[in-house]
Amino acid sequence: LYAALTMLLAPISYGNLQFRISEALCVLPVFFPYTSVGLFLGCALANMISAAGILDVIFGSLATLGAGLCAAACGREARRTGAMPSTAKRVLACLSPVVWNGIVIGAVLAWSFARDAFWQSFLLFGAEVALGEAGVLFLLGMPLISLIPRIFHLERKNAA
């Protein structure tokens, strides 16, 4: 699903100003930790057509895996108790792809396209990627965290 969404929406999914809708799926590990691996593989597949080449395939996929594992950690207590994750945990789960991709993809793009001005490009590209990630995660990912328990009929207890 990640790869299909990314490739289907390719014009907005690649580059320094990207709005990769598939990144909203990075909240799935909050409830289903094993989906981190699927996100990693989907990202690797999607990044095979990236202009940044093999660096994006390797490091972009690892960034998505890192973000997924962080999201899974944010949901650990909620999965154990059956309650919805706290607001703070939901925000952290959404911030994790923003941070991972801002740093990693910012570096990949700077290295791939502006090596002579790496640090300046890294800061600019990283900020642009993080901004797009934040848009996707907070506009789509945050509501998805609220919808997943209803969609999958997960047992919910009142959070204290």
Where are these regions (language model features)?
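Small-polar-interrupted transmembrane alpha-helices in polytopic inner-membrane proteins
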Residues: 2, 39-47
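Hydrophobic transmembrane alpha-helices
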Residues: 1-37
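Membrane-embedded alpha-helical hairpins and interfacial helices in multi-pass inner-membrane proteins
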Residues: 10-16, 24, 45-62, 66, ...
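A generic, lipid-embedded transmembrane alpha helix
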Residues: 31-42, 101-106
